[in-house]
Amino acid sequence: MTRLWELLRSILLWFVSWLHFLIFVPVLIALAIVLDPRKHDWLQRGLCRRIAYFSGAKIVVKRSPGFDAQRTCIFMVNHVNVFDPFMLYCGIPQLVRGWELESHFRIPIYGWLMKRFGNVPVPNIRNPRDLKRLWRMTQEAINGGTSLIIFPEGKRTRDGHVNDFEEGGFRLAQQLGVPIVPASLVGSFHHLRTGDWTLRPTTITIFLHDTIETKDLKKEDVPELKARIKEIIARPVEEWLQQGSQQESRPAAEVLR
C-alpha cells in the first residue's frame, strides 16, 4: 500500500510540475526575445520556487557567517538530480547562471534559451582552443556581475554521497582569481534519485558556506583547494545520510515514539 501511495503521489507531483513548467516557459521565452533576462530575474525565481513547491520540496537556506552575498563568485555544488538548478536558484541571493554542456545548446529552443539567459557552454576541454573559449566566456560572465554554478563532480550521485571532483573549475577559479563559495544540497537525494523517478516530499537545505579566496593561490595549490572544498561540501551531506541510516535501523516502535 505504501509503494502504491508513493507511485500515485509521484504521478500527481510530476503532472502538476510539468503542467506549470509548460505553461510558464513560453512566457519566459517571449520575455527573453524582447527583454534582457536580467530585467525579469524575479519572474525566473518565481518559476523556480513554484517548481520546488509543486514537486514536493520545501527549501531552507543556511548561510555561514563568512558567506559574502555581495561578491560575484563561483558556486561549487554537489550534483544530485535534475531539480538541482531550480533549487539553487531559489536559494542563492544574487544573479547566477551555470556551466552547462555545450551539447545542450544544440537542443532546439532550449539551447537558444540557455544562451540567451547567459549560461556558459562547456566544450570538449581536450581542445586548447575550446578551453580558452570557456575561460574567456567565464571571465566575461564574472566581469558582468553574474555568478556561476559549477557541479565539479561532472555527474549526478548514484548513492547520495559526494563523488570525486574534477579539477577544471578549480584551475579556472585560481587562474582568474575568482572567489569560490562551496554549497551543499542536503535532502535532494530523498526528493529524487537518479534512476528512480519517484518524487518524495521533503525539506531540501541549501548550505552556503564561507567564501574562499583564490587570488593569491598558485597552480600547485589547486589540488589542496579541491580537496578542502569537497570536504566542506560533503560534511553536511554525510551527516544527513548518517542520520537517515540511523533512523532506518531503529525499531519501528522506537521510530513512532
Which residue ranges define each predicted feature?
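Hydrophobic alpha-helical segments of integral membrane proteins
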Residues: 4, 8-11, 15, 43-51, ...
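A generic structural signal for well-ordered alpha-helical segments
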Residues: 51-52, 114, 141, 173
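A hydrophobic membrane-anchoring feature enriched in long, contiguous, low-charge segments
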Residues: 4, 8-33
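Short gly/ser/thr-rich secondary-structure transition/capping motifs
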Residues: 55-62, 131-132, 188-190
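Catalytic core of membrane glycerolipid acyltransferases/transacylases, capturing the structured
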Residues: 24-45, 52-56, 63, 67-127
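Non-catalytic C-terminal accessory region of glycerolipid acyltransferases
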Residues: 4, 132-257
